[in-house]
Amino acid sequence: RFNGEVVAMTGDGVNDAPAIKLADIGVAMGITGTDVAKDTADMVLTDDNYASIVAAVEQGRIIYSNIRKFVYYLISCNLAEIMIIFLATAFGRYLYPFAAGEVFSPLAPIQLLLLNLVTDGAPALALGTEKGDPDIMQQKPRPPKEPIINRFMMNGVLIQTVAITFITLFAFGVGLKHDRLMAETMAFITLASSELLRA
């Protein structure tokens, strides 16, 4: 542990309690273990089977991976929605000079609510309950201090946000040449489709 490694310690007796407490992950035996060892441990093996540790690590990796996918998806989609509303409201007269200087939002409030309920919720829920990669146990352990959204993912968020924002604002501009209702509908359909494709 002093060399920076993540250490798990298993034990069942009172004499194991100090080592279990010092370890990053203390594991006590549920059947043969003493109450002191169980109280000190982070995890208790109810069946006293060491193979359960491997299953628990696998489940933990899958859950963490799904949380990352869930957060990654929601950040990129919601950031795109924010940018679309902000850019169209703040710079609409420059982006769409043919619209006679009107200040507008590409999406009605009810459309934003529907987007957040349907296209954000359902795919995010599906991502959060995925079975996980089949080779998840062959992957290297992640550094304990690594953030949920790492630098690679943040670059992906920025690229996806810019792409979704640009496509939606372009569709809104095309629709605006006809009328406001068509523009809002085109922006809504484009944004919803982009978010579903992103999932």
PLM region spans:
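Membrane-embedded transport module
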Residues: 1-8, 28-199
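Alpha-to-beta junction loops
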Residues: 24-26
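Acidic, divalent-metal-coordinating active-site segment for phosphoryl/phosphodiester hydrolysis
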Residues: 13-22
